[in-house]
């Protein structure tokens, strides 16, 4: 199946065990909803329902997140898939916190110029489309690691709902029709497998409300259900991925898959107005950027400004500009960048310096080419 490059938010799952158990089934809009015992939030109501059922059956937050993630592999083909990667931040009822990094990794055969032609120009959008654009997937390994360390229910039980969703099918939606129309327009051979999977008879879009089944995905998920991480990184699935790559000019090998490892990392921890903030560390920029922004915002009386007032939005924009400038300048993969000044970036003293550079009567520039030199 053709895969496209997955960016920062491959999938987002929120499992909150603080707030009767319910699932909001509306697909559109943002509607605040309370719950007293538990809440599962995802991009698709069927995935959220699957995760909520895990909680009702006595599973914990990590169990629910795993089930929700695999269900999204079925219901959210544009992002929530097993062919990408992601991050997980965990904070337990006992106060312990940890994070898991399972982002995609470059194959061993990757090189600096693999996307460029003889003139140094990107070839055929190959950095965004096609087999060269993807890294070695990490989702299955990451969820497997999180389950081994923090899960409570049997792995097979947690993956089962996604297998059933793929086998039995679920109603297509207008959103899905819009997303999958992309494949209908593609004529290159590399898209043949995707068209078979995502289009009716390989040619037509499923109409909203029509049942969509994914037997090949169900088979892949079944191997993961029964064999754990080896059901993806070794054996039949790995062989199928390697064969596809070879056929279409990709470079991911069975060895790349077998060698993939997720990692558990110490979280970014800070404090905002008395609240502990726990975030994802690099290679994610999220934890550092959020903490940097909050530290700057702490210097302002936001309540007095009023929500979405001109003054409030100005401060918020300026704070974000500074955090994203530092994000571009400093944050990378710690496996290749050992000297990131993380403690400085999330310190209160540094936030004081940045906040002092904000002028209330003047907007600063948003120039990515000059990031890192604009403010201090």
Show where each model-derived region lies:
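Internal maturation/activation junctions in enzymes
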Residues: 299-376
